[in-house]
From Swiss-Prot:
ATP binds at residues 147-202. It comes from Marinobacter nauticus (strain ATCC 700491 / DSM 11845 / VT8) (Marinobacter aquaeolei). Its EC number is 6.3.2.4. GO terms for biological process: cell wall organization; peptidoglycan biosynthetic process; regulation of cell shape. One of its GO terms (cellular component) is cytosol. This is D-alanine--D-alanine ligase.
Length: 325
């Protein structure tokens, strides 16, 4: 595991004028999705960092009806640390937007697109960006035909879950049918795509710039939920191990993916490299994890940006254009 920590960079304090301009900030965390526990960890880390930087910030554990979050708000803007359905799929963004409350991250359409892995791939494909061949699967009876069309191994995933929840690797039509049934219990829409054999990379994006890429390796079959948040044997490579030209190509691809979906301010793009050296887009995360295992803070640190500065820079983009603070 990487020995990067948030504490190796000098303490960061937001400028007093910026603190005044931001007003009171509510960090929304928790939620009712399958990623609730991860979101609570992210939200608590973000809240502590904002407070450490001098921002007037409070935490809000969001559960139940999202419409209630804007009833008589006692805050000026929201830092969204909700992962998964409700908080990352455009729903909360629409509610806050209608209420006139500024919020961090991507707007409604980009959030909804990025949360839908199948439609994200349609956009990538339509824009000529490389993404593994795929099919939408709606019944067990399609397993034989999908294997005939795509070959094996394959990745099976619920189309609207994050944090690698529900993802399986399969090597036959029988395994695909079983994996489909498991994924369908989590989501009405199931995505099947060709499995790319090779190293995995992730590129974090901040204010339309790519941070240093991170190479990922794990003793698990792939970078799954346990490897992301629980395991101590996950290895992070910073520098990522690619030649400089290849890392630049990787970063440009990540920026292209972020832009074609219309995302803003910050996010993370997951990419595979095959044995021939070609890169393949997997997905875009518009509210990535911000825990002690999370990748965006690691990439920021490699760029000389402390965790406190990172969250303040994300938050600063909620200010109206023309405000110089």
């Amino acid at each position: 595991m990487s020995d990067l920590t948030h504490n190796d960079i000098q303490p960061y304090q937001a400028h007093p004028e910026l603190v005044r301009a931001l007003g009171r900030v509510a960090v929304f965390m928790g939620g009712d999705s399958a990623e609730r526990e991860v979101s609570l960890k992210s939200g608590k880390a973000v809240l502590a960092a904002l407070q450490s930087a001098g921002i007037d910030a409070v935490g809000r554990d969001i559960q139940g009806c999202l419409l209630r979050t804007v009833d008589e708000p006692d805050f000026d803007r929201v830092f969204i640390a909700l992962h998964g359905r409700g908080g990352e799929d455009g729903t909360l963004q629409a509610i806050l937007g209608q209420a006139g409350i500024p919020y961090t991250g991507s707007e409604v359409l980009a959030s909804a697109l990025a949360m839908d892995k199948l439609r994200t791939k349609y956009v990538f494909e339509g824009c000529g960006l490389p993404t593994p061949a795929f099919r939408a699967m709606t019944s067990v009876g399609e397993a034989e035909g999908i294997v005939a069309a795509l070959g094996t191994p394959l990745s099976v995933k619920p189309a609207h879950e994050g944090s690698s929840i529900g993802i399986r690797k399969v090597n036959s039509a029988a395994e695909l049918a079983e994996a489909y049934e498991a994924a369908a219990r989590l989501d009405d829409l199931v995505l099947v795509e060709q499995w790319i054999e090779g190293p995995e990379f992730t590129v974090s994006l901040l204010q339309d710039k790519a941070l240093p890429a991170i190479g990922l390796s794990t003793d698990h079959a792939f970078y799954d939920y346990d490897a992301k948040y629980l395991a101590d044997d996950t290895r992070y490579r910073i520098p990522c191990g690619l030649a400089p030209d290849d890392e630049l190509r990787l970063q440009h691809l990540a920026l292209d993916a972020f832009r074609v979906l219309g995302c803003r301010t910050w996010g993370r793009v997951d990419i595979m490299q095959d044995r021939a050296g070609e890169f393949w887009l997997l997905e875009v995360n518009t509210v990535p994890g911000m825990t002690d295992h999370s990748l965006v803070p690691m990439a920021a640190k490699a760029a000389g940006i402390s965790f406190e500065e990172l969250v303040v820079r994300i938050l600063r983009d909620t200010l109206a254009e023309g405000i110089d603070a």
